[in-house]
């Protein structure tokens, strides 16, 4: 299939549609930056949350069919663990603990590390292209290319989905996934 070059406006619309934003509301490039940041942070949060769930279920021996941890939330031990340990733990440390519990494929670990890196740059900087790792190219790199392009954002979403599906299947089994 031939690659079609999109102009900035067409690419902005395609990115917005890819992440489910009403394109009639986008007014300029800064709006696209906000959409992109929202998508990156959302995917990061989903992965962070499922890593946390794997850790909680391991340490508190909670079966996969128990939802929302209602019984566990009634205990002080669980509340302290979640609020003072898990909530303050960064994603790479959560991944490290999950890897200690059981192996995580290298490709999934690499995806999670890339997602963490790009989320860090976008969430902590108004101009992530000026960070030292991006300054030479002026791009916000994800897997070696600018995540602000439609193709790279597609790869980011596919990668995030791959990581999430692996973690979900590890936790609940593939039969419980709602595709």
What positions do the PLM features span?
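Amphipathic alpha-helical interface elements
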Residues: 1-99, 103-117, 121-135, 151-179
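Internal interaction segment
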Residues: 144-150
